Curated annotation (Swiss-Prot):
Protein name per the record: Transcription initiation factor IIB
InterPro entries xref list: Cyclin-like_dom (IPR013763), Cyclin-like_sf (IPR036915), TFIIB (IPR000812), TFIIB_arc (IPR023484), TFIIB_CS (IPR023486), TFIIB_cyclin (IPR013150), Znf_TFIIB (IPR013137)
SUPFAM superfamilies attached to this UniProt entry: Cyclin-like, Zinc beta-ribbon
Organism in which the protein naturally occurs: Methanobrevibacter smithii (strain ATCC 35061 / DSM 861 / OCM 144 / PS)
CDD domains per the UniProt record, alphabetical: CYCLIN_TFIIB_archaea_like_rpt1, CYCLIN_TFIIB_archaea_like_rpt2
Top-level taxonomy: Archaea, Methanobacteriati, Methanobacteriota, Methanomada group, Methanobacteria
Disulfide bonds: none
GO function terms (MF aspect): DNA-binding transcription factor activity; TBP-class protein binding; zinc ion binding
Gene Ontology biological-process entries: transcription preinitiation complex assembly
Zinc finger (TFIIB-type): 9-41
UniProt keyword annotations, A-Z: Metal-binding, Repeat, Transcription, Transcription regulation, Zinc, Zinc-finger
Spans of repeat Sequence: 127-210, 221-302
Entries under PROSITE patterns matching the protein: TFIIB, ZF_TFIIB
């Protein structure tokens, strides 16, 4: 039976067995106990739309609500736009005598959407954020989180005296750490047209002023992405994570860059499993030097007594 969990106030417990798991079957207008099957109510009112749909395609066509609210657009996606195709609601062409009027309306409507200084700032910054996110291959959840951080910075008047690009980059870096989608400062700076130093300085400023608490980045967070880009197997990825966890237990990762530790662990795992990759390949993917790979490799193999040779 298709239905939803019934949560109305008038009946929350089955009078027969005492179960609180009640199912609302809107097709039959019944409320049924999921435990014993007792029909509790036969006059359930369907609060859904008045139209009917017999498959998903019809449902999509007849749904009249808009897109969900998103923080990645300056107006949160709540405003409307006049279509540029010069067609009315029924798909018919707009008469030629009215097209000049539609052009003027469209022009004014665009101006009205972005009228104030704050809206212009958000429109530019969020488009920049979307561009940087696309180049970094970040998921939508990270973009939403970064947009929230940037909006908080605007609301708290933290933008003045700083470049929009720098604040956007710092917001992205904070969102990546919050969502456990790690990206290095070098990667953020490369796509954001600001220096690594500025990104780091602005990031520290935002986290301090907005009281954002973020856990330190773990080398484990970088392993899946590096392993995928290197074409290593899932077994190699698991082995690298085991190596990192043992190293963390012994305190070998303290004061070490997480990308360097992750890269060295993956290199060791590739050697152990016969999926050998060159140090240059691993270093290029991780954004570290070959010297860093060799140093971390030596520390891990000696301290963990792994007995692996280059």
């Amino acid at each position: 039976m298709q239905g939803d969990v019934y949560d109305k106030d008038k009946q929350t417990v089955c009078p027969e067995c005492g179960s609180t798991e009640l199912i609302g079957d809107y097709e039959r207008a019944e409320v049924v106990c999921a435990h014993c099957g007792l029909v509790i109510d036969e006059n359930l009112v369907d609060m859904g739309p008045e139209w009917r749909a017999f498959d998903h395609e019809q449902r999509d066509k007849r749904t009249r609500v808009g897109a969900p609210i998103t923080y990645t657009i300056h107006d949160k996606g709540l405003s409307t736009m006049i279509d540029w195709r010069n067609k009315d609601i029924y798909g018919r062409d707009i008469p030629a005598r009215n097209r000049a009027q539609w052009y003027r309306l469209r022009k004014w409507q665009r101006k009205i959407r972005i009228s104030g200084a704050t809206e212009r700032n958000l429109a530019f910054a969020l488009s920049e954020l979307d561009r940087d996110s696309s180049r970094l291959g970040l998921p939508r959840s990270v973009r939403e989180a970064a947009s929230v951080v940037y909006r908080s910075a605007v609301d708290n008047k933290l933008i003045r005296g700083r470049s929009i690009e720098g604040v956007v980059a710092a917001s992205l870096y904070a969102a990546c750490r919050r969502c456990n989608v790690p990206r290095t400062l070098d990667e953020i700076a490369e796509v954001s047209r600001v220096t690594k130093k500025e990104v780091g300085r602005t990031y520290r400023f935002l986290t301090r002023e907005l009281n954002i608490k973020l856990p330190p980045t773990s080398p484990v967070d970088y392993v899946p992405r590096f392993a995928s880009e290197l074409g290593l197997s899932g077994e190699a990825q698991s082995r690298a994570i085991e190596i990192i966890e043992k190293a963390m237990e012994k305190g070998l990762t303290s004061g070490r860059g997480p990308t360097g530790v992750a890269a060295a662990a993956l290199y060791i795992a590739s050697v152990l499993l016969g999926e050998r990759k060159t140090q240059r390949d691993v270093a290029d993917i991780a954004g570290v030097t070959e010297v860093t790979i060799r140093n971390r490799y030596k520390e891990l193999t000696e301290q963990l007594e792994m007995g692996v040779t280059l």
